[in-house]
């Protein structure tokens, strides 16, 4: 089985590649940085075909890579637009940014923290915007996959937004889902995890995971009283668990459409059991 992972050198993507190699799959990673996006060299990386190309600039450049592929997994996405890379490079940046956003919105009354802003940013091709990355790139690569006769396209979407984050984040994810689902001859899958964490790859995500674990527990105990918090009220998942779920989803012909958190957990467990 050959799979093509868009964003294979990223936070989630490299977990998908690693687990797919362990399963014996032929794996191709596509990103603008190739294997250069990974800081630590590991043995499994030698078995991945690292393709360096810009699918946003030229989606058709994917066609040779997609030849004979059984599935495409798109793990590309952005959580923020402004200074996104700088925030991630600062170990305290993402935590302080999101916690400050949460604290500034959690206790406001009479407002919906996820309500759309009066103005929506204009679509900007080949730039780092929600419209360009979360929506347009996903749609275009799905169309190219169908053109290349790839039968399965798995898009890593999201459970919800979170207070303080631009509502365009989740809006563009849902728009991508709707358009991709219209593409004929393509089994489209939309994974909807909440917050993803990994103590080894990004230690700072552990702090947020602990916070969201508490808030999600309270939300369940209060029958959804904290639903307005979006992702902050949903159970966080390890990035490896989402990667396992992605591999199970593409290998199971019955899986299509949105896959929510509880289903992700079940699929991850199922794939892990089959791999033992």
Curated annotation (Swiss-Prot):
Pfam families: Epimerase. Keywords: Mitochondrion, Ubiquinone biosynthesis. It is found in: Mitochondrion. GO terms for molecular function: protein-containing complex binding. GO terms for cellular component: mitochondrial matrix; mitochondrion. GO terms for biological process: ubiquinone biosynthetic process. Disruption phenotype: Strongly decreases cellular coenzyme Q levels. Increases cellular sulfide levels. Decreases coq4 protein level. Sensitive to hydrogen peroxide, copper(II) sulfate, and mildly sensitive to thermal stress. Decreases growth on minimal medium. The keyword Phosphoprotein does not apply. Acts in the coenzyme Q biosynthetic pathway. Belongs to the NAD(P)-dependent epimerase/dehydratase family. This is Ubiquinone biosynthesis protein coq11, mitochondrial. It comes from Schizosaccharomyces pombe (strain 972 / ATCC 24843) (Fission yeast). The gene is coq11.
């Amino acid at each position: 089985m050959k799979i093509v992972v868009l964003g294979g050198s990223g936070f989630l993507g490299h977990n998908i590649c690693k687990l797919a190699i362990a399963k014996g799959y032929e794996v191709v990673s596509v990103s603008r940085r190739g294997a250069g996006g990974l800081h630590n060299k590991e043995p499994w990386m030698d078995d991945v075909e690292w393709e360096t190309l810009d699918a946003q600039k030229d989606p058709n450049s994917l066609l040779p890579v997609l030849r004979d592929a059984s599935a495409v997994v798109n793990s590309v996405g952005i959580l923020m637009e402004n200074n996104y890379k700088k925030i991630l490079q600062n170990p305290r940046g993402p935590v302080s940014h999101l916690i400050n956003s949460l604290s500034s919105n959690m206790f406001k009354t009479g407002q919906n923290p996820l309500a759309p802003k009066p103005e929506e940013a204009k679509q900007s091709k080949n730039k780092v915007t929600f419209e360009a990355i979360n929506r347009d790139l996903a749609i275009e690569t799905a169309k190219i996959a169908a053109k290349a006769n790839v039968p399965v396209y798995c898009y890593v979407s999201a459970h919800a937004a979170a207070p303080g984050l631009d509502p365009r984040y989740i809006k563009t994810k849902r728009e991508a889902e709707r358009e991709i689902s219209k593409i004929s001859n393509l089994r489209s899958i939309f994974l909807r995890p909440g917050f993803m964490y990994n103590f080894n790859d990004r230690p700072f995500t552990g702090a947020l995971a602990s916070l969201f674990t508490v808030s999600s527990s309270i939300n369940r105990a209060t029958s959804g009283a904290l639903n307005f918090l979006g992702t902050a009220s949903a159970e966080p998942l390890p990035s490896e668990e989402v990667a396992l779920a992605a591999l199970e989803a593409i290998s199971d012909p019955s899986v299509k459409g949105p896959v929510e958190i509880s289903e992700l957990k079940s699929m991850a467990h199922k794939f892990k059991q089959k791999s033992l």
